[in-house]
Amino acid sequence: MEPIKNLPRLCRTLGYEFKNIELLTQALTHRSAANKHNERLEFLGDSILSIVISDALYHQFPKATEGDLSRMRATLVRGDTLTLIAKAFKLGDYLFLGPGELKSGGFRRESILADAVEAIIGAIYLDSDLEVCRKLLLHWYAERLAEIQPGVNQKDAKTLLQEYLQGLKKPLPDYQVINIEGDAHDQTFTVECRIDDLSESVIGVASSRRKAEQIAAAQVLELLKK
């Protein structure tokens, strides 16, 4: 857990300086850690993200159908995309978690990371206004919005990675579960993904094997773009 004195560093990473730093602290606080947690901010941020991305897609693709717009929005706001954004910001280093969540690796769990991104969006909105949120989110999403196309990038990460490697006539990815933690009703899966083009495996952590594989595949795709 990152000491609070480092929150200004996170602000620089986010590209936003909070007037009320307590809003950011709350956005990073999981319900396991305190009564004043981030779930209400997450609710707010989810709605703001949806309207900003919907508006951006509507104007970017004037001829796209409602179905294509909905699928593109779903791709951009779904949990694995938010998890990648959280990892880029290193949010796991700043989360405030209860002892149980901390011990079970909650700072890596995809749902907690994705929820924290939405909570931060809600906190920024309360600290500023919708227009500030819009500009910041469009900056965060600039590369993804530039790449997305109607009917193209709506496949999940595992499918996209498989098709990419098949197109190059390369071996398919190898996914292995390397760790399972927690009780049967609340497990955390750690999966590694290996491909020939990367010297080291990439790790995905999630509440199910399938989700962990998707997160690992998405990170491999990000690395292959570089």
Swiss-Prot record:
EC main group: hydrolase
Annotated catalytic residues: 46, 118
Residue ranges constituting the DRBM domain according to the UniProt record: 156-226
Cofactor(s) essential for the protein: Mg(2+)
One Gene Ontology cellular component: cytoplasm
EC number(s) given by UniProt: 3.1.26.3
Pfam family, one: Ribonucleas_3_3
Keyword Nuclease belongs to the record: yes
Catalyzed reaction equations: Endonucleolytic cleavage to 5'-phosphomonoester
Keywords: Cytoplasm, Endonuclease, Hydrolase, Magnesium, Metal-binding, mRNA processing, Nuclease, RNA-binding, rRNA processing, rRNA-binding, tRNA processing
Coiled coil ranges: none
RNase III domain mapped to chain residues: 7-129
Top-level division of the source organism's lineage: Bacteria
GO BP of this protein: mRNA processing; regulation of gene expression; rRNA processing; tRNA processing
Subcellular location: Cytoplasm
Family (UniProt): Belongs to the ribonuclease III family.
Assembly: Homodimer.
Official protein name in the record: Ribonuclease 3
Organism, as annotated: Shewanella sp. (strain MR-4)
Name of the gene encoding the protein in the UniProt record: rnc
